Amino acid sequence: MKIVIDLMGADHGVLPVIEGVSRALENKSFSAVLVGDKDKATPFISKELASKVEMIHTQDYIKMEEAATEAIKRKESSIYLGMDILKNGADALISAGHSGATMGLATLRLGRIKGVERPAICTLMPSVGKRPSVLLDAGANTDCKPEYLIDFALMGYEYAKSVLHYDSPKVGLLSNGEEDIKGNMLVKETHKMLKAYDFFYGNVEGSDIFKGVVDVVVCDGFMGNVVLKTTEGVASAIGSVFKDEIKSSFKSKMGALMLKNAFGILKQKTDYAEYGGAPLLGVNKSVIISHGKSNARAIECAIYQAISAVESQVCLRITQAFESLNPSVSACQSDQQDA
C-alpha cells in the first residue's frame, strides 16, 4: 500500500509530519511518499527512516492565506504533485496543509464518484458511548441542496459500516428539534427525502451528537463546521479549567491523581489528534484532510485512518451504493426535485 504525505503547509512545519510518519511505519507496513521541501525535511529524517520512504522534492506549496483556486495553477506545489501521484497509482493521500486546495484538487484531479453531486468532509465526534459519531459535511459545502445531504447520508452510512464496522448504522439529520416539522427549508425538504431510506432515524439535536443517539449525523457544511469548531473550543476550554483547578490546591492535586485513569479516557475521547483527520468522501481515491495544527500523533492516526479506508475499500463501497440505489428511492428524489 502506497500512501502520499504532503509535508508542506502545516502550522508547525515539517517536523510533526515526519515524526508521525516515522511512528506509523513502526506499527504498520506501507510505502510512504513524502512530498515537500527536501532541504527542510532532511535534517529530521534519520538514516533508518530515509531507507523506508521516498522523497519527492518541491519548495512550492499553497499557503493558508492564499485562495484555494491557486492550487490548480501551481503544478509544482506539494499538494498538486501529491494528488498526481495518488491519481497515478498510490492508494491514499494525507495533507495538513490548505484544506480548500486539497478538496479542490481532489475533486478536479481524482474526479467525483458517479452519482455524487458534492464530496463531503467526514469527521469523527466524541460520544458518551464506546464509539464515536460520524458528522458530515464538516465544511466542504457551505450552501447545500437537499440532494447533497442525501448524498452525505449515503456516504456517511457506507463509511460507518465499511471503515468503522458499525452494524446497521443509523443516520440522523441535524436540526433544531426532533420533531418532523422542525428545521429550515433545507432540513424539512431533506427530511422528506430521507424517509425513503431504512437507515434514517429522524431529526437529531446538537446534544444528540455526543450522546450516541445515532451513528451518522448529516448537515450542511456551514453548520457542520460550526459544530466542529465549537466542540474543539469547548473541549479546549474545559481542559484549561481542569488544569487550573487541579493546580489550585493540594486536595485538588490528590483528587486528580486518584482520577488519573478517568482523565486519561476523557482526554483520549476529546483529543482531535486521536481521530487523525477527516476523510473527503465522494472522490475516487482516499484523501484524508488533517488539522493544520496537527501534531505527530494526529499525523500517525491519520495514516492509520487512511490504511483502514483503503483496506475496507470504502470508495468502492460508496460507488456500489450509488450504482445500486433502489429505483423507488431515485423516483422519490426526482419527485422532490420536480416539486
Curated annotation (Swiss-Prot):
Q: Which GO terms describe its biological process?
A: fatty acid biosynthetic process; phospholipid biosynthetic process
According to UniProt, the reaction catalysed is: a fatty acyl-[ACP] + phosphate = an acyl phosphate + holo-[ACP]
Keywords in alphabetical order, please: Cytoplasm, Lipid biosynthesis, Lipid metabolism, Phospholipid biosynthesis, Phospholipid metabolism, Transferase
This protein's record includes keyword Cytoplasm = yes
Please give the chief subcellular localization of this protein. cytoplasm
Name the InterPro entries for this protein.
FA_synthesis, Phospholipid_synth_PlsX-like
What is the E.C. number? Answer: 2.3.1.274
Report which superkingdom the organism of origin falls in.
Answer: Bacteria
Query: GO molecular function terms here?
Result: phosphate:acyl-[acyl carrier protein] acyltransferase activity
The subcellular localization recorded is: Cytoplasm
Q: Which GO terms describe its cellular component?
A: cytoplasm
Q: Which SUPFAM superfamilies match?
A: Isocitrate/Isopropylmalate dehydrogenase-like
In which pathway is this protein known to take part?
Answer: Lipid metabolism; phospholipid metabolism
Summarizing the function annotation, the protein's role is:
Catalyzes the reversible formation of acyl-phosphate (acyl-PO(4)) from acyl-[acyl-carrier-protein] (acyl-ACP). This enzyme utilizes acyl-ACP as fatty acyl donor, but not acyl-CoA.
What family is this protein classified in?
A: Belongs to the PlsX family.
Q: How does it assemble?
A: Homodimer. Probably interacts with PlsY.
Q: What is this protein called?
A: Phosphate acyltransferase
Its lineage opens with:
Bacteria, Pseudomonadati, Campylobacterota, Epsilonproteobacteria, Campylobacterales
